[in-house]
């Protein structure tokens, strides 16, 4: 069985982390296009349907990186809840992604092994 989920989640969360804290209209437009392409590229048809449904009910918040990160965090927890997987708190998310992954990047490692990789 192909385990594509963890890599997709890391890409999504990293995109939100590196999103601008003061995005202009062009950055917001590019982020929306990126998310739509991201969802369209999901290898699972049912997952694509659920992701588009979530996006419709929970529009992106692109005021800054923090808002975008919170959207990705809530989306990930929504999926995990549906799959009966672990739900994490906002502080756990911040620890996992802002500390662990950014430290990994700082030290020049490219294999992003997030704590959610097995979730």
UniProtKB/Swiss-Prot annotation:
Single Gene Ontology MF annotation: flavin adenine dinucleotide binding
Where located? Host cytoplasm; Virion
Its recorded name reads FAD-linked sulfhydryl oxidase
The organism's lineage is: Viruses, Varidnaviria, Bamfordvirae, Nucleocytoviricota, Pokkesviricetes
Q: Which family does it belong to?
A: Belongs to the asfivirus B119L family.
One short Pfam name that applies is Evr1_Alr
Protein induction: Expressed in the late phase of the viral replicative cycle.
* Disulfide bond among keywords: yes
- Family annotation (PROSITE patterns): ERV_ALR
């Amino acid at each position: 069985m192909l385990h594509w989920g963890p890599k997709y989640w890391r890409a999504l969360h990293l995109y939100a982390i590196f999103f601008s804290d003061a995005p202009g209209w062009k950055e917001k437009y590019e982020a929306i296009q990126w998310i739509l392409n991201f969802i369209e590229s999901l290898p699972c048809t049912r997952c694509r349907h659920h992701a588009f449904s979530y996006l419709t009910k929970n529009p992106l918040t692109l005021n800054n990186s923090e808002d975008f990160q919170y959207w990705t965090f809530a989306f990930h927890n929504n999926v995990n809840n549906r799959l009966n997987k672990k739900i994490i708190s906002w502080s756990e998310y911040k620890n996992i992604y802002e500390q662990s992954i950014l430290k990994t990047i700082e030290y020049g490692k490219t294999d992003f092994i997030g704590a959610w990789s097995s979730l």
